[in-house]
């Protein structure tokens, strides 16, 4: 019988859940907002509530939980090491330890853009390639780099952070990371909403656009 895993994607707007088999097929999925009350509820509390609701009585036995999370992730410890200011109260959160205690399953945690890249290499558009660059566009902008078949994480887990290379260093838009003119401030959903509203459009969020 095929092994089943729980995939959890924690983004700046929502947490997405999926039951996934060992071949990468998604058996069931769900989504819940993490910003529904302006982040007053701790993000990991929302994530745990979503998982409890998602795991019904007929859920197959799980082998483990794999978490892709926004921010600078210490993948060895499963802890959030840093953010660029998009996600309040996120730095220092022990995702791995908290979820292992709550659900009694082994948990692996990595940066969301790196997970996207590895997923594409494993079972998607980049299957069979050893040198790949991937870019994620969402609440923020993320990136992952595979070179020679190895993921480039860097000493601090920032090796693929493409959202923070600077397009307009002298007179650009201020970024939440503290720099000026980062790519994220022009390409992310938040940037599109900002620009649409400046044009007088009714655009409360990215889904509307």
What are the roles of these predicted feature ranges?
Residues 36, 40-48, 52, 61-65, ...:
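Glycine-rich phosphate-binding loop and adjoining helix at the ATP-binding site
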Residues 2-45, 49, 60, 79-82, ...:
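Short glycine-rich, Thr/Ser-proximal phosphate-binding strand/loop in the N-terminal lobe
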Residues 21, 69-73, 169:
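Short, small-residue-rich loop/turn micro-motifs
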Residues 21, 63-67, 204:
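Short coil-to-beta-strand
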Residues 18-20, 28-31, 38-42, 100-102, ...:
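Glycine/GP-enriched mid-protein hinge/lid loop-to-helix segment characteristic of carbohydrate kinases
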Residues 13, 70-73, 138-140:
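Short glycine-rich anion-binding loops that position phosphate/pyrophosphate groups of nucleotides
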